[in-house]
Amino acid sequence: MATDTAAPAAMKVDGSALAGRALAAAGARHMFGVVGIPVTSLASRAAAAGVRFLAFRNEQSAGYAAAAYGFLTGSPGLLLTVSGPGCVHGLAGLSHATANAWPLLMVSGSCSQPDAGRGDFQELDQIAATKPFIKIAVKATTIADIPRLVFQALAATVSGRPGGCYLDIPSDVLHQTLTESEAAALIDAAAADSAKSDSSPPKHKSLDEGIEKAAELLRRAERPLVVFGKGAAYSRAEDAIWKLVDTTGIPFLPTPMGKGVVPDTHPLSATAARSLAIGQCDVALVVGARLNWLLHFGEPPKWSKDVKFILVDVCEEEIELRKPHVGIVGDAKRVVELINREIKDQPFCLAPSHPWVEAITKKARDNVLKMEAQLAKDVVPFNFLTPLRIIRDAILAEGNPAPVVVSEGANTMDVGRAVLVQNEPRTRLDAGTWGTMGVGLGFCVAAAVAEPDRLVVAVEGDSGFGFSAMEVETLVRYQLPVVVIVFNNNGVYGGDRRSPDEITGPYKDDPAPTSFVPAAGYHKMMEAFGGKGYLVETPDELKSALSESFRARKPAVINVIIDPYAGAESGRMQHKN
């Protein structure tokens, strides 16, 4: 009998296998993408090395999944694409991650180096294509480059302000080989070099002074406010911020994806008194949230012209751009811990009877009562409020761990933000800084694999759902515990709302630009792949569908028929349209 006498050290390892092993050695656990030339083998080899590969139907959705994974875990999300158009499709997720300051590494195959510039298959200068959206772009020109660049690029995604990075591996490099011993040595060397590098941001020279000034400003303020965003959620600052709120009695306001860092049900929540809180506060501690359009740029008339901002951000450029009264460069969790320590030396606490606290809590209570009065009505055909109330109650009934809620759409997301309750951090994913539509089902997959003990509930407008609807097959293929609820109001913002005098011109018989096929059977898409579909038009039907699907924890689509005239065009962004 013939035997293979070759020593293990002499066995060959190609570039795909080396990349997979390097990713695993660097701590990667999940990768999202679409396979094809030249990266199919890379996906398989990475899986063999311990990196679970989640195969999508579209690189955009895979990219959004990788971005959300970075936010949820604090570790880089991995996106794998083919060359050329696959790389271009991946730019959606890559840019979304960078815009939201989430760590993501996109790995793409590219054309063979000897054929570059000659019109090779799917040829594109992918380094140039990705550069506007990333922190760094690196290219492996030989197989020996791969481990070092994997570790380098992954580290760059999380250093300083998190964001997207890009690794380009040409097809000829993926096919190059070296021995097992050479591969192991390269990975060991890359790991050792990475361990020597301190990726944590250096202590800023003005940190101590900034902490002292922040504590003193809060102590002297008559109407202080704590504002926190998804940056605080990303840094796991919830314990520190909750302690700050409880020990000082300062009201707080979360941005949409900051919801849950401190429970929405906390008595000092100013969410339902937002206009009063930002309009009258005299000192605002802003943690992990940028003073961009979401916070009205920190300017009048929404904010008082005399407000003093204490801005905490990991990015020094953000501080320099906004020019706050006090700017502190640093990790949100660490900075708030230091503020707590400083306050402990000279403690203060606003009592519930403090005029500012009383004004906030009274306004919030009054607005909540008004909202609850509207929510208590069972309106059929459905408006947005009735089904959202039923969904809210079903989600809250799940208890702990709370489901991750994915919210996408115009009216669906806007109204849902006011109705749905988050009591745990990182349990709300939405369109984010860019207001990106198309993130929904990619986010669902990311949440399901990043938080396997949680149910995932997507509350989607029918337009938002349409961007990634084919990924229902992905949900079924991996049997993920995701329930997708589609608010079906026949179009973008609603059905055909045109008045007769608007229906003119040579194409007047065409559907309105905002309208879809009425009462489309979105639930049947899920059924086509073996999942569970529900069509609901009444409160009892919705309650039954939610109860059954939540209990099953299997892929499901609940198609909720909404009055096409409910809601408003452009949601709450009419002034931008």
UniProtKB/Swiss-Prot annotation:
SUPFAM superfamilies registered for this protein in UniProt: DHS-like NAD/FAD-binding domain, Thiamin diphosphate-binding fold (THDP-binding)
CDD domains: TPP_BZL_OCoD_HPCL, TPP_PYR_POX_like
GO terms (BP aspect): fatty acid alpha-oxidation
Binding site for thiamine diphosphate: E59
Annotated positions binding Mg(2+): D462, N489
GO molecular function list: 2-hydroxyacyl-CoA lyase activity; magnesium ion binding; thiamine pyrophosphate binding
Keyword Metal-binding attached: yes
Name listed for the protein in its UniProt record: 2-hydroxyacyl-CoA lyase
